[in-house]
Amino acid sequence: MSNNLEINNREYPSSFSKTAIVICLDGSQKEYLEEASKSNLTPNLDKLIASGENLLVHSAIPSFTNPNNISIVTGQPSSVHGICGNFFYTPETGEEVMMNDPKYMRAPTIFEKFYNSGSKIALVTAKDKLRTLLGNGLSFDDERAICFSAEKSD
């Protein structure tokens, strides 16, 4: 019997001896960070990178904030997790609907699965539109999970 968690057909260690920090810089390029580092503009990020991992992922297509971030936290493409854009058009009403509601998600996030296995989860996002998607499946009543955005941190 494995002590790993299976999340969307991928295995992850079920317990960590170290803290995991995931930083998604949507719309950035690694060259921007390299130049900032050379100019000593990112000392804290440089320390995190030096003491851990620095992994580059390819963007999901379509290359928009919501599908890219959800692909990162589910390990799946939009066709599997369900978030195919930032908005979709509803012909019946003629309106654009923002895809920031978890009801559109068809795959759990790594955060949800680790939370359900007993882990504590802290999520911080710059954009509030991602908060409900990233925090999907977490309960904020038992002090094991927190999720907020810098955009609406008050």
PLM ranges: what are they?
Residues 13-16, 65, 115-116:
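Extracellular/periplasmic catalytic domains that process cell-envelope and extracellular macromolecules
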